[in-house]
Amino acid sequence: MPLSTSLLGKKSTYKDSYDATLLFKIPRINNRNELGINSNNLPFYGVDIWNTYELSCLNKNGKPWVGVGTFYIPTDSENIVESKSFKLYLNSFNNFVVESVEELERIILQDLSNVTHAKVTGRIFPINTKIEFSIPSGKNIDDLDIVCNNYGPPDNSLIEYEDVLVEEEINSNLLKSNCLVTGQPDWGTIVIKYKGKKLKHDSFLKYLISFRNCNEFAEQCAERIFTDIKNAINPDFLSIYIVYTRRGGIDICPYRFTNKSYTLPSDKRFIRQ
Protein backbone atom coordinates (compact mmCIF):
# COMPACT_ATOMS: atom_id res chain seq x y z
CA MET A 1 0.00 0.00 0.00
CA PRO A 2 1.27 3.53 -0.73
CA LEU A 3 2.40 5.66 2.20
CA SER A 4 -0.43 8.11 1.49
CA THR A 5 -2.90 5.47 2.73
CA SER A 6 -1.24 5.25 6.16
CA LEU A 7 -2.58 7.03 9.25
CA LEU A 8 0.58 9.08 9.70
CA GLY A 9 -0.25 12.77 9.91
CA LYS A 10 -4.00 12.12 9.95
CA LYS A 11 -6.63 12.32 12.66
CA SER A 12 -7.12 8.84 14.07
CA THR A 13 -9.57 6.98 16.25
CA TYR A 14 -8.20 4.67 18.92
CA LYS A 15 -9.65 1.16 18.78
CA ASP A 16 -11.33 -0.30 21.88
CA SER A 17 -10.17 -3.82 21.09
CA TYR A 18 -7.01 -5.53 19.92
CA ASP A 19 -6.51 -5.19 16.17
CA ALA A 20 -3.40 -6.48 14.40
CA THR A 21 -4.58 -4.99 11.09
CA LEU A 22 -3.67 -1.53 12.40
CA LEU A 23 0.00 -2.25 11.66
CA PHE A 24 1.01 -0.51 8.41
CA LYS A 25 4.01 -1.88 6.53
CA ILE A 26 6.47 0.13 4.45
CA PRO A 27 8.79 -1.78 2.08
CA ARG A 28 12.45 -1.10 2.81
CA ILE A 29 13.35 -1.47 -0.86
CA ASN A 30 11.84 1.90 -1.80
CA ASN A 31 14.27 3.98 0.25
CA ARG A 32 17.19 1.62 -0.36
CA ASN A 33 16.86 1.95 -4.11
CA GLU A 34 17.25 5.71 -3.70
CA LEU A 35 20.50 5.15 -1.79
CA GLY A 36 21.83 2.59 -4.26
CA ILE A 37 21.60 -0.22 -1.70
CA ASN A 38 21.04 -3.71 -3.08
CA SER A 39 18.38 -5.30 -0.87
CA ASN A 40 19.54 -8.76 -1.96
CA ASN A 41 23.13 -8.07 -0.92
CA LEU A 42 23.06 -5.60 1.97
CA PRO A 43 26.36 -3.84 2.81
CA PHE A 44 25.54 -4.06 6.51
CA TYR A 45 23.96 -6.11 9.28
CA GLY A 46 21.90 -4.74 12.13
CA VAL A 47 18.52 -4.04 13.68
CA ASP A 48 16.04 -1.28 14.30
CA ILE A 49 15.49 -1.14 18.05
CA TRP A 50 12.02 0.09 19.01
CA ASN A 51 11.46 1.10 22.64
CA THR A 52 7.80 1.47 23.64
CA TYR A 53 6.89 3.39 26.78
CA GLU A 54 3.07 3.33 26.60
CA LEU A 55 2.14 -0.34 26.82
CA SER A 56 -0.87 -1.57 28.77
CA CYS A 57 -3.43 -4.38 28.90
CA LEU A 58 -5.83 -6.03 31.37
CA ASN A 59 -5.05 -9.09 33.44
CA LYS A 60 -7.53 -11.97 33.79
CA ASN A 61 -9.27 -10.10 36.63
CA GLY A 62 -9.75 -7.00 34.49
CA LYS A 63 -7.05 -5.04 36.32
CA PRO A 64 -4.84 -2.80 34.15
CA TRP A 65 -1.16 -3.60 33.79
CA VAL A 66 1.49 -1.26 32.38
CA GLY A 67 5.00 -1.91 31.15
CA VAL A 68 7.62 -1.03 28.59
CA GLY A 69 8.83 -3.02 25.62
CA THR A 70 11.91 -3.32 23.44
CA PHE A 71 11.58 -4.90 20.00
CA TYR A 72 14.28 -5.72 17.45
CA ILE A 73 13.40 -5.60 13.75
CA PRO A 74 16.26 -7.04 11.66
CA THR A 75 17.62 -4.98 8.78
CA ASP A 76 17.00 -7.78 6.32
CA SER A 77 13.25 -7.61 6.96
CA GLU A 78 11.20 -6.93 3.86
CA ASN A 79 9.23 -4.16 5.58
CA ILE A 80 9.42 -1.68 8.41
CA VAL A 81 6.42 -0.59 10.48
CA GLU A 82 5.02 2.92 10.19
CA SER A 83 5.40 4.39 13.68
CA LYS A 84 1.92 5.87 14.19
CA SER A 85 0.31 2.59 13.17
CA PHE A 86 2.46 0.84 15.78
CA LYS A 87 1.30 3.33 18.41
CA LEU A 88 -2.36 2.74 17.52
CA TYR A 89 -1.76 -1.00 17.48
CA LEU A 90 -0.20 -0.99 20.95
CA ASN A 91 -3.08 1.09 22.30
CA SER A 92 -5.55 -1.48 20.99
CA PHE A 93 -4.36 -3.70 23.87
CA ASN A 94 -5.57 -1.21 26.50
CA ASN A 95 -8.84 -3.10 27.11
CA PHE A 96 -7.60 -6.50 25.99
CA VAL A 97 -7.36 -9.31 28.55
CA VAL A 98 -4.21 -11.43 28.54
CA GLU A 99 -3.30 -14.33 30.79
CA SER A 100 0.28 -13.16 31.30
CA VAL A 101 2.94 -10.73 30.15
CA GLU A 102 4.47 -13.64 28.24
CA GLU A 103 1.27 -14.00 26.22
CA LEU A 104 1.25 -10.28 25.39
CA GLU A 105 4.88 -10.52 24.31
CA ARG A 106 4.15 -13.54 22.13
CA ILE A 107 1.23 -11.82 20.38
CA ILE A 108 3.17 -8.63 19.64
CA LEU A 109 6.25 -10.46 18.38
CA GLN A 110 4.14 -12.64 16.10
CA ASP A 111 2.23 -9.67 14.68
CA LEU A 112 5.43 -7.71 14.05
CA SER A 113 7.04 -10.73 12.41
CA ASN A 114 4.02 -11.15 10.16
CA VAL A 115 3.96 -7.55 8.95
CA THR A 116 7.75 -7.18 8.50
CA HIS A 117 8.22 -10.66 6.98
CA ALA A 118 11.09 -11.35 9.38
CA LYS A 119 11.70 -12.87 12.80
CA VAL A 120 11.22 -10.01 15.25
CA THR A 121 12.53 -10.49 18.78
CA GLY A 122 12.05 -8.47 21.93
CA ARG A 123 11.11 -8.26 25.57
CA ILE A 124 8.45 -6.65 27.72
CA PHE A 125 9.41 -5.34 31.15
CA PRO A 126 7.44 -4.38 34.26
CA ILE A 127 7.27 -0.63 34.79
CA ASN A 128 9.42 -0.84 37.94
CA THR A 129 12.40 -2.33 36.09
CA LYS A 130 15.56 -0.39 36.89
CA ILE A 131 17.07 1.18 33.77
CA GLU A 132 20.38 3.04 33.93
CA PHE A 133 21.32 6.06 31.87
CA SER A 134 24.70 6.40 30.22
CA ILE A 135 26.55 8.89 28.05
CA PRO A 136 27.48 8.10 24.44
CA SER A 137 30.81 6.33 24.12
CA GLY A 138 33.69 7.83 22.16
CA LYS A 139 34.80 11.40 21.49
CA ASN A 140 32.06 14.01 21.29
CA ILE A 141 32.58 16.42 18.39
CA ASP A 142 29.81 18.93 19.14
CA ASP A 143 32.03 21.63 20.65
CA LEU A 144 34.10 22.13 17.50
CA ASP A 145 34.08 25.78 16.39
CA ILE A 146 32.63 25.54 12.90
CA VAL A 147 30.60 27.78 10.60
CA CYS A 148 27.41 26.15 9.29
CA ASN A 149 25.22 27.22 6.39
CA ASN A 150 23.94 23.92 4.97
CA TYR A 151 20.88 22.43 6.66
CA GLY A 152 19.62 20.21 3.87
CA PRO A 153 19.44 18.23 1.79
CA PRO A 154 22.20 16.03 3.26
CA ASP A 155 25.47 16.79 1.49
CA ASN A 156 27.97 13.92 1.41
CA SER A 157 30.54 16.18 -0.29
CA LEU A 158 31.09 17.68 3.17
CA ILE A 159 32.74 14.45 4.35
CA GLU A 160 36.50 14.94 4.30
CA TYR A 161 39.24 12.65 5.53
CA GLU A 162 42.96 12.47 6.20
CA ASP A 163 45.15 9.91 4.46
CA VAL A 164 46.03 8.18 7.72
CA LEU A 165 44.55 4.99 9.14
CA VAL A 166 42.85 5.15 12.52
CA GLU A 167 40.46 3.19 14.68
CA GLU A 168 38.19 5.54 16.58
CA GLU A 169 34.74 6.21 17.98
CA ILE A 170 32.99 9.57 17.75
CA ASN A 171 29.55 10.82 18.72
CA SER A 172 27.28 13.82 18.28
CA ASN A 173 24.01 15.00 19.81
CA LEU A 174 23.35 17.47 16.99
CA LEU A 175 21.67 15.13 14.53
CA LYS A 176 18.18 16.27 13.59
CA SER A 177 15.89 15.41 10.72
CA ASN A 178 12.14 15.54 10.12
CA CYS A 179 9.48 12.89 9.64
CA LEU A 180 9.00 12.18 5.95
CA VAL A 181 5.22 12.61 6.17
CA THR A 182 4.38 14.96 9.07
CA GLY A 183 7.51 17.11 9.15
CA GLN A 184 7.77 16.63 12.92
CA PRO A 185 11.35 16.88 14.20
CA ASP A 186 13.35 13.75 14.99
CA TRP A 187 16.17 14.46 17.45
CA GLY A 188 19.01 11.97 17.62
CA THR A 189 22.34 11.09 19.18
CA ILE A 190 24.68 9.24 16.83
CA VAL A 191 27.63 7.03 17.77
CA ILE A 192 30.04 6.00 15.02
CA LYS A 193 32.83 3.43 15.28
CA TYR A 194 35.11 2.80 12.36
CA LYS A 195 38.54 1.60 11.27
CA GLY A 196 39.95 3.28 8.20
CA LYS A 197 40.97 6.65 6.85
CA LYS A 198 40.49 9.32 9.51
CA LEU A 199 37.36 11.40 9.17
CA LYS A 200 37.95 15.12 9.63
CA HIS A 201 35.74 15.86 12.61
CA ASP A 202 34.89 19.44 11.70
CA SER A 203 33.71 18.62 8.19
CA PHE A 204 31.89 15.52 9.39
CA LEU A 205 29.97 17.57 11.95
CA LYS A 206 28.91 19.90 9.15
CA TYR A 207 27.73 16.84 7.24
CA LEU A 208 25.59 15.67 10.16
CA ILE A 209 24.11 19.15 10.54
CA SER A 210 23.14 19.10 6.86
CA PHE A 211 20.40 16.60 7.84
CA ARG A 212 18.67 19.28 9.91
CA ASN A 213 15.87 20.03 7.42
CA CYS A 214 15.90 16.61 5.75
CA ASN A 215 12.57 14.76 5.52
CA GLU A 216 13.32 11.06 5.88
CA PHE A 217 12.42 8.18 8.14
CA ALA A 218 14.90 7.37 10.92
CA GLU A 219 15.93 4.11 9.27
CA GLN A 220 16.74 5.82 5.98
CA CYS A 221 18.80 8.54 7.69
CA ALA A 222 20.91 5.85 9.36
CA GLU A 223 21.45 3.98 6.11
CA ARG A 224 22.25 7.19 4.24
CA ILE A 225 24.93 8.09 6.79
CA PHE A 226 26.33 4.55 6.71
CA THR A 227 26.44 4.56 2.90
CA ASP A 228 28.00 8.01 2.67
CA ILE A 229 30.80 7.11 5.11
CA LYS A 230 31.42 3.80 3.38
CA ASN A 231 31.64 5.46 -0.02
CA ALA A 232 33.94 8.20 1.30
CA ILE A 233 36.58 6.20 3.20
CA ASN A 234 35.81 2.51 2.48
CA PRO A 235 36.56 1.53 6.10
CA ASP A 236 37.63 -1.95 7.21
CA PHE A 237 34.93 -1.73 9.88
CA LEU A 238 32.00 0.62 10.41
CA SER A 239 29.09 0.81 12.83
CA ILE A 240 26.37 3.45 13.07
CA TYR A 241 24.07 3.66 16.09
CA ILE A 242 21.44 6.41 16.28
CA VAL A 243 19.33 6.89 19.39
CA TYR A 244 16.30 9.04 18.64
CA THR A 245 14.16 10.72 21.26
CA ARG A 246 10.69 9.35 21.77
CA ARG A 247 7.63 10.57 19.91
CA GLY A 248 4.17 9.20 20.62
CA GLY A 249 5.54 6.97 23.35
CA ILE A 250 8.02 5.27 20.99
CA ASP A 251 11.67 5.80 20.15
CA ILE A 252 13.44 4.19 17.20
CA CYS A 253 17.15 3.39 17.34
CA PRO A 254 18.65 2.16 14.04
CA TYR A 255 21.89 0.17 14.32
CA ARG A 256 24.02 -0.76 11.30
CA PHE A 257 27.43 -2.47 11.23
CA THR A 258 29.73 -4.33 8.84
CA ASN A 259 30.79 -7.21 11.11
CA LYS A 260 28.17 -9.96 11.40
CA SER A 261 29.40 -11.00 14.85
CA TYR A 262 29.17 -7.46 16.28
CA THR A 263 27.20 -7.18 19.50
CA LEU A 264 24.11 -5.11 20.19
CA PRO A 265 24.30 -1.95 22.33
CA SER A 266 23.63 -2.26 26.05
CA ASP A 267 20.16 -1.67 27.47
CA LYS A 268 21.33 1.62 28.96
CA ARG A 269 19.66 4.73 27.60
CA PHE A 270 20.93 8.22 26.92
CA ILE A 271 19.55 11.14 28.92
CA ARG A 272 17.18 12.36 26.16
CA GLN A 273 15.37 9.04 26.04
From Swiss-Prot:
Active site (UniProt): C179 (thioimide intermediate), D186 (proton donor)
InterPro entries linked: GTP-CH-I_C/QueF, NADPH_dep_7-cyano-7-deazaG_red, QueF, QueF_N, QueF_type2
Protein's UniProt keywords contain Cytoplasm: yes
Enzyme class label: oxidoreductase
Catalytic activity as recorded in UniProt: 7-aminomethyl-7-carbaguanine + 2 NADP(+) = 7-cyano-7-deazaguanine + 2 NADPH + 3 H(+)
Entry binding sites for substrate: V81, E82, S83, A218, E219
GO CC field: cytoplasm
Keywords of this entry: Cytoplasm, NADP, Oxidoreductase, Queuosine biosynthesis
GO biological process: queuosine biosynthetic process; tRNA modification
Binding site for NADPH: S83, K84, R247, G248
EC number: 1.7.1.13
A single MF term (Gene Ontology): preQ1 synthase activity
Subcellular location(s) of the protein: Cytoplasm
Pathway(s) this gene product operates in, as recorded in its UniProt entry: tRNA modification; tRNA-queuosine biosynthesis
Primary role: Catalyzes the NADPH-dependent reduction of 7-cyano-7-deazaguanine (preQ0) to 7-aminomethyl-7-deazaguanine (preQ1).
Quaternary structure note: Homodimer.
Membership in a protein family: Belongs to the GTP cyclohydrolase I family. QueF type 2 subfamily.
NCBIfam families for this protein: QueF
Name of the molecule in the record: NADPH-dependent 7-cyano-7-deazaguanine reductase
Species assigned in the record: Rickettsia felis (strain ATCC VR-1525 / URRWXCal2) (Rickettsia azadi)
Source species taxonomy: Bacteria, Pseudomonadati, Pseudomonadota, Alphaproteobacteria, Rickettsiales
Gene coding for it: queF
